[in-house]
Amino acid sequence: VADETTVEQAKQLIGLLWRREVPPRPGGRGPKQTVSVDAVVRAAIALADRDGYAKVSIRAVAAELGLRPMSLYTYVPSKDALAVLMADAVADEDAPIAPELPLRDRMAAIARQARAELLAHPWLLEVPPWRLVLGPGRMRRFERQLAAIDDIGRSEVELDRVIAVLTEFATGNARMAVAARRETQVMTDAQWWDVHGPLLSGAMSPEAFPLASRVGKVVGELYEAPGDPDGAFDYGLNRLLDGILPASIGP
């Protein structure tokens, strides 16, 4: 059984998430708020986009808004709660998926939107996704995703799993793409290889790794980088859709 503190925290967070849909609970008189919760969330998102999730704190967001740190607690109770609000706001940025598109394109759009969101807001990869409390933004996105594939005529469980597989694939690829982008801001891949390539060539014998040497030579010349997240995403998504569609649109 949850303790009273956990229940109260849940009520507070859900009230913040659904603040437009659910009337605020009556409470005591407190300090007058000079900005909106929306403004706090927007400031936190801008800060995370610019400086990274680690730099987001109640104090830092308050500074962005020209407020005293303690006053921000009248809007959000903690950084954890703020992160949930941030993720929910970002989820509402997805465009609708056109229903007239072929089913394969609609499924691909689910994965592409999930990846694009993470590339635009890489700090989302640092927000714990398990038990992330649902708000209207994430629920509207889920509704849009379900609407995009509802005509495959399959069970509710399969609809949910199709979306989960597509978004989890996109998340894994986005994580690699974000890592590559961060690394190349410090040193280009060509500069990195100039240092490590000759040393690795001296340590690794092609005779000991004939297949890896053959494939590595070809892809190294093609990618001019340790990998190709964009190409891997397109290839992997197509293979994933090849596997999903026969089971989804069969008789």
Question: How would you describe each model-predicted region?
Answer:
Residues 141-198, 244-247:
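Hydrophobic alpha-helical bundle segments that form small-molecule/ligand-binding pockets
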Residues 95-140, 156-159, 163-166:
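Hydrophobic alpha-helical connector segments
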Residues 43-51, 89, 93, 99, ...:
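Solvent-exposed, amphipathic alpha-helical segments
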Residues 39, 43, 47-81, 85:
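Helix-turn-helix
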Residues 1-34, 209-220:
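N-terminal intrinsically disordered/low-complexity leader segments
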Residues 168-185, 202-226, 242-250:
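Amphipathic C-terminal alpha-helical segment
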Residues 39-46, 81-96, 109-113, 140-147:
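Alpha-helical structural segments
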Residues 41, 104, 230-241:
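Short, amphipathic alpha-helical "lid/cap" segments that border enzyme active or binding sites
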